[in-house]
Amino acid sequence: MKRYLLAYLIIICLGFYPEQVVAAKSTSNSSKILTQNISDSLTAIANTVIFSDRINQVKIDVNQALKTIKITAGDNFGHLPFRKDNVDRIYSALYSILEKTYPNYIIKAEVYGRDIRELIPNYLSNKIDSSRIYKNTSPTIPLITRLSTPFSVTNGLQNRHVALWNSHGRHFSQLEGKWIWQRPRLFTTAEDLLTTSFVLPFLAPMLENAGANIFIPRERDVQTNEVIVDNDDKTTSRYRETHRRYHWQKGDTGFSNKNEYYVYPENPFKMGTYRQIKTTINDDDISTAEWVPDIPEKGLYAVYVAYQTTENSTEDARYTVHHLGGATEFLVNQTMFGGSWLYLGHFLFDTGINNDCKVTLSNLSKDKNRILTADAIKFGGGMGNIAVLQDKRQIDKSFTDNANTSNFPRFAEGAKYWLQWAGVPDSIYSRNSNTNEYSDDFQSRGFWVNYLSGGSVVNPKAEGLKVPIDLAFAFHTDAGISGNDSIVGTLGICTVNNNGNNNGNSNGNTANTLYKNGVSRWAARDMVDLIQTQIVDDLKQTWHPEWTRRGIWNKSYSEARVPEVPTMLLELLSHQNFEDMKYALDPRFRFTVSRAIYKGILKHLAYTNNFEYVVQPLPVKEFSCKFISDDSIRLTWQETIDSLEITAKPDSFIVYTRINDGGFDNGKIISGNSYVLEIESGKIYSFKVSAVNKGGESFPSEILSAYKHPQNKETVLIVNGFDRISGPENFNLITLAGFMTDRDAGVPYLYDISFTGNQYVFSPDSAYYDNENPGFGASKSDYENMVIAGNTFDYTYLHGESIKEAQYSFTSTSVQSVISGEINLQDYKAIDLILGKQKQTFSGKLKNKPEFQTFPLALQHKLTDYCNNGGNILVSGAYVASDMYDYSKEDNDNFVSSLLKVKPLDKDTIIFSGVLYESQYSNFLKKSRHFEYYHEPNTNMYSVEKPDLLESTDEDAFEICRYEGNDYAAGVAYKGVYKACTLGFPFETIKDGKTRNLIMSDILSFFFNSKP
């Protein structure tokens, strides 16, 4: 009986099992097909918007009872910038794939536990999520009010406070026992310096020009000198006080610069005292404090003030910075940011102790009996003074004899070291109790943001400096290599969940996705989306039509996770990818990127705070300066239209004036595009112009100068034809590629702080091993602690000094004003054309023609007409002949050879730094004189890697100087119907001022005194 029963059970099993297996396999295969199709569709849609890896881990969660389907996928799905159109396409694809299997089901696609429709940014959505609108509604008085600015920002970033930092910096590695960069030297730079070259010259000034108060957890002044003036310290600098009704009194703990260097956890803001006094509303009762620095070297110095915040601090401490351009006033709200270094601006100071170069503080206020405090004032950036110990037992004071500093400018160091110097608690800058300085550095930045905002309306329960920070922005570049000459591109990162998870799920704790003020941390994703979109869109329209957008990551990065304000971590491009770096090294690209970030921040804050934004204008163009009488000058300029931003139209302009070698004044507002002013003879006047509107101020124009000789001598017109700024020359031969900085290092904007040294590994097949052996792109370190001079756009003054010494008058103009006809060359008997390192330069993939040509066709016509009418012309530049010369032609029938009577010789020769100045012609020096020009990177003047070697093309042309050690001509003069003098190196790069004066005097004597 049992056997029959067993057989029966076996039969039943055999009868039914195969059918069940088939059904299970069928269901499994069907599910795989569906998930595969969904993965294919999502990946295809994603790659129309961003560069995306395959979207895998698709899950189909079916609820048969409710007839709903929830679709989720891996992290890549969340990287999309969701928009109504791509969300509609996603849902359309999902319904198309699933409707046959699951008819009439409602589908919901989710990322991080949220419907993707909810992740359309608020500023693009019809359904606003008010929980993620982060705004400061408190009418806070801004930390700094600039009283001397001749215009007001009403539709920009006024009253906004932004925390900003430029990635990594020099830090001490306990593992290696030395100071190192956090990233390798690649393609002539390191990320630690590369991001700084965006933030300091471009992004920070743009934000401040829009009215924002900017906070950077690193030194922002590239001036390597530093002077501290303090009430506690007796130095050659002076601190003084005056008293009237109220007297200055000793305060509590404050700053004192007691040590040559500081070790962990020393705090210089706990080593001294501060001063305090009551405020007054009466002009007759004013008391003052005065800080007079002993400046070691004339130059631009950042001014930082220190004070303490007390219970009844004043909201309008009146600081006046006296500098070589005049006096600039500020109001500082001392109810916040006490006990640290507050940056006011950069100013020109003279060498030594000068009563015209100082800072004063007055107790005059709108409110009486508030408390005004005064502590140290810092001039300049200086060198790093935070020391470390090579032994891990560095907290033990017995080891302080082994302390060493970085020996680098402070701006090159990481945040950790600046924060210690700036009085920030060691619990902020050293989260690892000084046992891991690498981690301390990157972790400190986010906690510093919270320290800034602690006690303010945005972070009310925390201890801190009470600054109502609106947002934070971390500027990085990334690693990674992309083949086929493609761009790695731009990545945006936020962290929605502050518990350290790599997703937006709150694990049941909604507090994990809220800031301290109760606003949803999803606000950060909206901000990241907007700024990343602005960057990529602008780059596609100006530099590369296929610039890569990588996506929006919601991952746990300390810099994005820790701050209690919306924070973006930007990975702009890959510093390891040659194609990306061809753009990154170009100052114009840096300007475009920085302007895009500024616009993104502006638009984000405009949306969240419900105001109409206006973008600051672009710099003016076609600037000219000419005499209209013996004692008056007319300046003219034209606005620049911004094709990317309709609101960036100027309302008015500001003219800044400098007299002789002083500094620029605070500017005069001008409604039109011209300005007439009276001048005194015997003084050199210099001018620059900026455009302004309700959103802020543009970057300044080039600088033009003019001088009227007291005896009303002939006037020389200086034409500035040197407006080039560019990255270094590059090449790509498939098997070899890179940057040829020894041939043409490019031209920095004002200065360069990113150059470490020449590239020495050119093989793309050379692999990364470690930071000291990074493979393809590896570069030297010769110049990594140098601030390298670039194009200051101020060479009309330098040329003008020599013309003045030769006893002639001069005025100046941009070359564009000559081409446009605003300036008529025929009005002048002699012109001095500055070409510097002007050279045809290709950039980007949207520009079919080169920029910065030495002699564009329209200029050729103007110069030819001028010379044919008996004019006299001096031209100097590193590419004065070679830029226009077509080596494929055997004849000399081109503009340079026919007008200037020179042709270039092969540049691929040895570098010459010395010039022998001598000539047999009576108007030029017969006795030999040796001089040098700048041919290597330096701090004083842009350098010329390869000057032009000249050869005369006319029997009436003759050599006036030659490169030392050979017979190549460095300068050629011509005397015929007109007179011409051509120098194969820029005149302004001659190192010795007396030599410049001598050569200019000889040339002008040749022009004006010799017979035709």
State each model region's role.
Residues 394-399, 412-525, 553-576:
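Active-site microenvironments of hydrolase-like enzyme catalytic domains
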Residues 187, 191, 198, 202-210, ...:
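Aromatic-Pro/Gly-enriched surface loop or interdomain linker
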Residues 287-311:
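A short beta-strand element within beta-rich, extracytoplasmic domains
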Residues 837-944, 955-957, 964, 994-995, ...:
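A glycine-rich, often tryptophan-bearing local segment used as a flexible ligand/cofactor-contacting loop or short
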Residues 604-647, 681, 695-714:
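Pro/Thr/Ser/Gly-rich low-complexity, intrinsically disordered linker/stalk tracts
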Residues 359-371:
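Short beta-strand-plus-loop segments that form exposed binding edges in beta-rich domains
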Residues 676-696:
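Beta-strand-rich modules
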Residues 357, 364, 376-384, 471, ...:
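Active-site-adjacent mobile loop/cap segments within catalytic or ligand-binding domains
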